[in-house]
Amino acid sequence: MFFNSLLTNFAALEVGQHLYWQIGNIRLHGQVFLTSWILLGALLVFISLGTKKMENDPKGLQNLLEFLWDYIRDLARTQIGEKVYRDWMPFIGTLFLFVFVSNWGGALIPWRLIKLPSGELGAPTADINTTIALALLVSLSYFYAGLSNKGWRYFEYYVHPTPIMLPFKILEDFTKPLSLSFRLFGNILADELVVGVLVFLVPLILPIPVMFLGLFTSAIQALIFATLAAYYIGEAVEEHH
Amino acid sequence: MLAFNFFGATEGGLFDINATLPLMAIQVVALTYILNSLFFKPVGKVVEKREKFVSDNIIEAKNKLSEVKKLEADLLTQLQSARTEAQRIVSEAENESDKLYKEALELANNEANASKEKARLEIESQTSAARDQLSKQADDLSELIVNRLILEK
């Protein structure tokens, strides 16, 4: 009885339902694009405001943006290495900012108040398409980084300490995007679900610590995603001696 | 397409993969270019300019500090040599004045001795002259007395 009602209530949380957009033959998850456009628009407005008048003595927003820039540079530099981190810093930074803004936007903005005909708005990173897209971009990036930096010698990496490693290294090329995408997707979706269920069951006070935990998880996941992406690129461009 | 029902969703589900994936990838790539020109490049330019400014200033300050230290050491040695020079001059002057004093003293002593000697000689000669005159007068007187006594007889 109780379980049944819980199930229907879960259905009220609309897990796994999407707002479909049909363009010709292709179908899109509209809610993902809607939230991502809103959040990325906010991010771009924020960044253009902060970089509008750059001064040598930073004031206000410029301070924050410079801190962010420095943070991303440190991340890229420690993972990728002094030599090529400059080429990859924008990509790593974009991954970090995109994931961070998506996660926090999904957690902080009460999207639930906006009613959609089907599905509901939420963090774009809680959709498997987004995370797989990001993970595949990372895979392409590290292949490109390795090949453009070392040419065919990139494949030495696969037999690096011994040729015995070959199958494992090939397997890694599949597990890397898989783990990247599912880690992010799982964490953000789980957080949304937990908060959703708690809000549904106990609307007062109790969800608040879980929401804070969710914010923490969101930030950590963004950091993990960017760090791992940078680490994979760094691994690909690293010179073996 | 991988899709299965989850909690009674009629279509789609959690693992509904469709064209959202490539479009999202294109969106992220576009975002990378936009953020690069809007955020990473301009902020990087400002930050690196400032870092260069700061490090240049630090290097300059270090150079100036070492220069100052060199000059200080230079001045110290100069001061030292000036001090010894001054000491040398002072002692030389002291010796000189000592010598001059001794010379002057000797000269004065000699002069004094000479004039003393001269005075003594003069006194002596005057004394002998006086004595001669006195004995001559005594002779004359005695002759006069003798002549008178002889004449009265």
UniProtKB/Swiss-Prot annotation, chain A:
| Record flagged with keyword Transmembrane helix | yes
Q: What are the annotated GO cellular component locations?
A: plasma membrane-derived thylakoid membrane; proton-transporting ATP synthase complex
Name the keywords, alphabetized: ATP synthesis, CF(0), Hydrogen ion transport, Ion transport, Membrane, Thylakoid, Transmembrane, Transmembrane helix, Transport
Single GO molecular function:
proton-transporting ATP synthase activity, rotational mechanism
Q: Which domain of life is it from?
A: Bacteria
CDD domains, from UniProt?
Answer: ATP-synt_Fo_a_6 (cd00310)
Return the InterPro entries for the record.
ATP_syn_F0_a_bact/chloroplast, ATP_synth_F0_asu, ATP_synth_F0_asu_AS, F0_ATP_A_sf
Which Gene3D superfamilies does the UniProt record give? ATP synthase, F0 complex, subunit A
Tell me the membrane topology, using the record's own terms: Multi-pass membrane protein
Principal localization reads membrane
| Subunit field text | F-type ATPases have 2 components, CF(1) - the catalytic core - and CF(0) - the membrane proton channel. CF(1) has five subunits: alpha(3), beta(3), gamma(1), delta(1), epsilon(1). CF(0) has four main subunits: a, b, b' and c.
Q: Name the protein family.
A: Belongs to the ATPase A chain family.
* The protein's name in its UniProt record: ATP synthase subunit a
Protein source organism = Prochlorococcus marinus (strain MIT 9301)
